[in-house]
Every structure is written in structure tokens, then in C-alpha cells.
Amino acid sequence: MNYFPNGDEEISLIKFIAKFQYLSVNDTKYFFSTQKYYRKRITSLVQKKYLRRTKSTLVLDELGIEYCKLFNFEYTPLNRNQKYFPRLLYISNLGAYFHNSKTTQFTPSFAMKDKEMFTITARKFIGVLDINGIEYLTYHISSEHTNKYILSVIYDIQKERKYKNIIVLIDDLNRINKQDFAFGNNQVLVIEDSEENREKLKYLNSVNWSRIIEKHYRNKAYIAEYNFCDYTDYKSKYISYFYFLDTEKINRIKYFLRENKNKNADIICTLKIKKEIQKELPTAHYIIVDLEDYIDKERIVYD
């Protein structure tokens, strides 16, 4: 028997678990280019004592810990506190999903270098998503979280000083009042947590908005100097675009319209996002665009 991990994929899996502590067996699929034999490969790593299976979760075993320390892999000691287990498993799931992404990297809260240990346990953020070099402090609100927890997320964002771009992944958008999530930051993206939206997140900063503007406004709109819109003709057009629901941008547009009763806003978005934004901005003029046509996507295929 070969007692070392077989190839880069198995090494990558071990490195991930060393950093994230836990990994659901179902999420191991994100680490292998072919799905045909990956469960056998997991079983082999368990037999070799690199990994240990606890119910449906994988953690490092004795040899796995030794291996990671030998090669100086980033290693996080296992947190056995059951109170934090659902949070840690969600963080691991998110990290595994973006593991192979060329545009998006996820750093868990406990691996953030700029946060003290007290901050990690006291604060509610789960980590940072880096999308094309832009960092987003990230939160998660699950179906199980109470209204008290939602309030604690709001307070947590209010006291954040470093990060001005925020992502809130939420199981059910109806759980929150969108107006409660405007803090004066650059962006607060409130996103329903689904596989479709996670895939879209990879291309958050990859949309060719200027091409969309050119198509619909024929070179008669320019990048705006205002904070309440993205483009304008400096006459009567105030144009904002939405890839996801941005509560900060909505709040700025609302304020502009409230102070300028004779003006309106043009909003460029998908039909799906329009249904949410229209609840907040019912009088805006909507231009519906299939944003897929304006994104160059990375190609990662799982068999």
C-alpha cells in the first residue's frame, strides 16, 4: 500500500481540512475532477489514518496532522465545542464550494490575520470573500437563526470599521427588513443562499456594464460623480445597475428620489432581481437585461 496521499487532489483535500477543521463527506466532490472513484479515495485516506470520519463529517486523523505539520500547511486545531459546530460546518461548505474558483477565494473568520481571537468568537461574520481582488466581509443568516441573532448581525455590521463591502447570505430573504441593512457602507449585498447565487457570486465583478450602457444609451451616458447612481447624462437620466440586491445603493436612490420629486431613476437588472428591488423602488424605470450575455465565465466541470 502507498502510505502517502495520491496526487494533488488528495493533498489539496487534506490541506483544506487542516485549515477549515471539518468537511462534510458530501462536499468532497469539490476536490476531485472525476466523481467516479472519489468515495473510494476518501475511504483509502481514512484507512491510511490521514482522515477520520465522524458520522457524515471528515476531520484530520493522526497521520494527517503529522503530514500537515511536516509540510508546514496552515493548521487550525479542531474546535470540539458543539455550540459552534453548525457554524463551522457552514463555513467549510462555503469554502469547499469556492475551493476551485479562479475568481473567488474564501477566508474563514478564524483564519483572518487582521482579527483578534476575541473578535472571532464575539463577532458574527463568518469570513471574507475575495472576488476579483475586492474583499467582502461575509455573514450568514440561516432558517434556524432567531430574530435576536439577526439583530446581532445588524449591530455587528454597524460597528465594523475596516470593511466597507458586505455580503449577507440568507436562507430566506423574507426574514429581514431590507431597510435595516443600510449603514452608510459602500455595498451591502443581501443574497439568498442558493447554489445558483453562489455560482453568480463568482462573476460579481466580471460584468461588462459599460457595454450594457452603450447598448441602451448610445454613448449618451457617462460614469457618474454622484453616489446615488452609476451612470448619468447629467440631465435627466440617473442610471444604477444591480447584479444582486444592494441595500446601500437602494437607500441612496431612495434618498435622491425623496429629495428630487420631479426626477426618476433608471435601474438595470435581471427580471429576478427586479422583483425584489421593485418592493423598495416601485416608481423606478426598469431595464431588464440577461447579464449572462455580458460575462466571461471560468470553466470548471465536475463529471
Model-assigned labels for residue ranges:
Residues 1-13, 81-84:
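Short alpha-helical segments that sit at the start of domains
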Residues 16-20:
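Short helix-capping/hinge SLiMs at alpha-helix to coil transitions
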Residues 21-32:
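Short acidic, hydrophobic short linear motifs in intrinsically disordered regions
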Residues 32-47, 52-53:
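Short amphipathic alpha-helical interaction segments
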Residues 43, 52-73:
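Accessory beta->alpha helical hairpin/"wing" motif in late/C-terminal subdomains of nucleic-acid enzymes
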Residues 64-97:
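Short, amphipathic alpha-helical interaction segments positioned at domain boundaries
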Residues 84-164, 168-172:
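Exposed, interaction-prone assembly regions rather than primary DNA-binding/catalytic cores
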Residues 138, 174-303:
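Long, compositionally biased intrinsically disordered regions
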